[in-house]
Amino acid sequence: MIQVLLVTICLAVFPYQGSSIILESGNVNDYEVVYPRKVTALPKGAAQPKYEDAMQYEFKVNGEPVVLHLEKNKELFSEDYSETHYSPDGREITTYPLVEDHCYYHGRIENDADSTASISACNGLKGHFKLQGETYLIEPLKLSDSEAHAVYKYENVEKEDEASKMCGVTETNWESYEPIKKASQLNLPPEQQRFPQTYIELVVVADHRMYTKYDGDKTEISSIIYEIVNTLTQIFRPLHIRVALIGLEIWSSGELSKVTLSADDTLEAFGEWRETVLMNRKRHDNAQLLTGMIFNETIEGRTYKSGMCNPKHSVGIVRDYRTRRHFVANRMAHELGHNLGIDHDRDSCTCGANSCIMSATVSNEPSSQFSDCSLNKYLNYIVRYQSTTRCLHNEPSETDIVSPPFCGNYFKEVGEDCDCGPPANCQNPCCDAATCKLTTGSQCAEGLCCDQCKFTKKGTACRPARGDWNDDTCTGQSADCPRNGLYG
């Protein structure tokens, strides 16, 4: 059983509250000061891990008490995660660090169904949380009092550049492409219209400009990337996509592919490097270049649309424009969205927020939600183009998960029948969120051959025909949709 650590935060208001202060996120005009004070609920004398599996924080925001629930993100790293950097003479140095007891968490605010949180607890509390529709950031204050933290709204951070930023992917003409089809129009029964579980094993590369920008501090660069991917995993979870960091590379001795003012040329060169070099030494599904280059034409990122799983095109480049990790994570999620066949949003697309992830114009306050258009486009893409996205269906072995099984992390592990997330978030009637077991009378909880918690009747089509191949059909004995391999 997971022990819960209770942490009380006492809110103090100081004379300089509301004045301007320079933080890692930039110049902040209005903030509150809090002092985290741990009050442990672990039994007296019990061994306390360095970073607990679950924590709660109580504090006030705008004078109102909130309770922040955090759970360690046990999907952050893939099994054979590695880190690579280069000696001054260009020699490759690869290590396999132990990452089980890391300090990166996801969470939510109690009694706020739409809340989210992505927090690093490595050195104090650092990250962001969404409360009542507004994004707040928290980070330690670099004062003589090391316990002081600042809490502030994202909108109160002064913008470095108010110029409109754009995604580098060419704006598509929606009418010129295959129309987006609603889930109900994909010739799939209702129970199969849920997103299939897919997996992206991700490599993030920091270029040499990033290395020099952070004064050669590889630890700092690694922490930045951890924070970005921690947010990525949360963003893609509603699509049933597990994003796991399988590799981190820092070009410490110089650029290994051409990085120029042209985003197109930089993307092409990085794709060629991935195809000819990286794929030969590291198994992965997608690679993203995080660069310190300021591209021409206010380009924030560039990628190949529908390039996922392609040796050269399953790549993206993202500019490390700000020190705000949430902003950069949003940009990387945007480029990954294009890799997954998702177009820019039209004006009519909505996500319940001021901006959505696939907006063509970069918002100063990044979104963490995909629009209704994006969800439909992704579902259409993943169902109709399975033959070109097979890398996404390589489910990691349940025995290869880095950390011990953890009910409530959305990932089915050894000893579990299903995992639909925390009880407050579970929407699967076939799965008991408290135990990660099937509910009484259920045969299955998900899968292309799972119909209202029962195995679909034998012979039911579960995957459309591909070229000269027949439809794949259910066996009646499993929720999986086997590849029949029969010519028509």
Swiss-Prot record:
Name the record gives this protein:
Zinc metalloproteinase-disintegrin 8
Q: Which residues are glycosylated?
A: 296
Q: Name one GO molecular function term.
A: metalloendopeptidase activity
PROSITE patterns with a match to the protein in the record: ADAM_MEPRO, DISINTEGRIN_1, DISINTEGRIN_2
Propeptide residue span(s): 21-191
Q: Which family does it belong to?
A: Belongs to the venom metalloproteinase (M12B) family. P-II subfamily.
Any single Gene Ontology cellular-component annotation: plasma membrane
Which species is the source of this protein?
A: Crotalus adamanteus (Eastern diamondback rattlesnake)
Short name of any one Pfam family annotated for the protein: Pep_M12B_propep
> InterPro entries this protein is in?
Disintegrin_CS, Disintegrin_dom, Disintegrin_dom_sf, MetalloPept_cat_dom_sf, Peptidase_M12B, Peptidase_M12B_N, Reprolysin_adamalysin
What does the record's cofactor remark say about binding? Answer: Binds 1 zinc ion per subunit.
Q: Where does Zn(2+) bind?
A: 334, 338, 344
The protein's matches in SMART domains, at most eight in alphabetical order, are given as: DISIN
